[in-house]
Amino acid sequence: MEKQTRKKRIVIRNKPVPEAFKGKVYLDPTYDPAFKALFDNEEALKDFLNGVLELEGDEMIKELRFRFEKPIEFRVPQRKKVIFDIFATTGSGRFLNIEMQRLEHDYFIDRTILYKAFLVIKGRKEMEESAEFKALPKKEREKRRYQLPETISVWICDFDLPEAKDEYWDEWALYSRHAIRNGIAVPLSKKNKYIFLSVPNFTKSADEVNGSAEMWLYLLNHARDGGELPDFGNEIVEEALDRIRVENADDKLLEAQEHDMTTKEDYECWAAGKELAAEARGEANAISVFEKLGASPEMIAQAKAMLAAEDSNTFK
């Protein structure tokens, strides 16, 4: 699976490549800017989702619309907003959100449920506003008052999966306890699904990779290693990798990648959880935990700044 020579893109830069990326072939796609660049193509996202959803033949996604950093806001009764990394809809009326999560925090599971609730409401709202739904007879619309569209949340995690340690793939759905006791582990509804993928726990070699989902997991895990990745014979994957090649990245992408770690909210949740745990063990604060874990000086400095901030206005 040797990499074939590909035509080099012409990139005009006004600044030198940052030191952090010198000697590396790709940008790390577990960080937000490179993650967006990797999937900034309908065919790439369809290939990934078809693999993750295990769709084949006529079931494969044929039409896909998507948007990065989609804000979803409702009043319940106070205003509440979440921002999806990727919000996507298929031609068949399926609604999806795809999240890249680098850090685990104490309320991660709660967060996945909250995001799913917003996705369900957003999907229902768009479904009832569609031309197809409005064209239905009044009685049919009334019958479907509580009908929900299929919604799928995909969480790509750079850590162990909740309730599935050491595994790289897990799925959640709504089950009947009675049915499970009787050996029938079938979801009550196929419309409500969570898929969790652990990037570091995907340890298959390039030769062991099978199917598009595993190809994407392999590159998500190994693009950050620094070297050239093998050619899997998938042109869509190769084009996606070209978008995160250091030599192809413009100043804007390189600058964003250099400064991006995770969202402010992730750091606040994670740092607060670590600090509380540290205090319970008699540690001075979360900084000592960072240092013992071997965190980089940059991460320690950023954590110190965040913990020292008196209010959210400190973060710009």
List each model region and its residues.
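Accessory alpha/beta interaction modules
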Residues: M1-K193, S205, A277, R281, ...
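Low-complexity, glycine/alanine/valine/leucine- and proline-rich hydrophobic stretches
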Residues: W172, I180-P200, V209-A223
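Short, charged alpha-helical interaction segments and adjacent helix-coil junctions
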Residues: E2-V25, P29, G51-V52, F87, ...
